[in-house]
Amino acid sequence: MKNTILVFVLLIVAIITGCSSSEASIETNEKVEITEDEVMPNNIIQGVMRDISPKEFVLDMGSGWNLGNTLDTEDVDVTAWGNPLTTKAMIDEIANMGFKTLRLPVTWQYHTGSAPEYLLETDWLNTVENIANFALSNDMYVIINIHHDDEWIVPTYENAPLVKDRLTKAWTQIANKFKPYGDYVIFETLNEPRHEGSPEEWEGGTAEGRDVVNQYHQVSVDAIRATGGNNAVRKIMVSTYAAGTGENVLQDYIVPNNDEDVIVSIHSYSPYLFSLAGTDPTWGTDEDKAQLTQEFNTIQNKFESEGRAVVMGEWGSTFSDNENDRLAHAEYYANLCAERGICPIWWDNGNADEFGIFNRNTLEWVYPEIAEAIVNATK
């Protein structure tokens, strides 16, 4: 059956980035009718695992879009940060624009039982699966991760034993849930693993922090692989410390078991003042382009030499009454990714005054030119 719900969308003011917990949806004062689709069948995609290299795989992922501020809310309510419930119609529109990959950020701690079992709620696993199937039914790749669980995933030697135990149990359950699915389902062990609130949080962390993050990735990959079946060879994205691109972060990054099916996951809101802080609304000079190109050259030099495929799991720019500059930045950024075989996945938090380029209430593109530029780069 289909249930029809009336959604009254109010003006909400908040501040959001891909890493914050204060959220908002796209502004509108319309009364919009949204159809809540029936649960998708879980057999819509055959469990095919292709014999394809990670680099070929990432090229086939094309360009991607993040369903931000929904399943990753730091609350039991997925609408707590202002976005509506996710419908198949939303994901259909993302696919119709030409995006081939959906990154599905998921926060698990509000849907997890107590120690020592740390059982994940069945209904929550089913919710994640249902939205994943929205993407899969459109022949899209879908990335499922552990996102805003930083409260308990603290990278210190003191915390490591308990965290590793819980990560092992979480990923065992997630991996078993999706084991029958083919390789269009991708796992991402951790979003931006870091010591939240520490002085070095966004500066590459400490040697201890980087070491422990590597350990957390290790147990996560081991847990996924141990479930067997399709998960024995499934592509897994593994992030650097805080998903950063700094010198110390890249230097200390370790691929668990030198696993050939691990894909590097990084994020870069560059340049910071334009993309994230929103205090410099202009972009596009030769110097701007040279600085961004240099960052991508550093990424390429590191991972090309190691034969690793790379996904840019989050990037974007905030709105500061500067649509032309944002378009120029998006075109240049997405093409830098495409030239290096990197899949660019735009961070969309649902807020048109920040990173939102798609209105999930009206199912319309607020900034279609930006979306088209991202998609066209990887065609």
Please identify what each model-predicted range represents.
Residues 15-18:
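C-terminal motif of bacterial Sec signal peptides marking the signal peptidase cleavage site
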Residues 77-96, 167-169, 292-299, 326-331:
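Short, acidic/polar
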Residues 85-107, 296-303, 336, 340-343:
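Catalytic domains of carbohydrate-active enzymes, especially glycoside hydrolases
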Residues 165-280, 285-288, 295-317, 339-340:
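Active-site region of glycoside hydrolase catalytic domains
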Residues 45, 82-102, 116-148, 152-189, ...:
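An active-site-proximal structural segment forming one wall of the substrate-binding cleft
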Residues 289, 293-367:
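Substrate-binding cleft of secreted/luminal carbohydrate-active enzymes
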Residues 67-86, 114-120, 159, 273-292, ...:
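Acidic/histidine-rich helix-loop elements
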Residues 27-101, 373, 377:
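N-terminal carbohydrate-binding accessory modules
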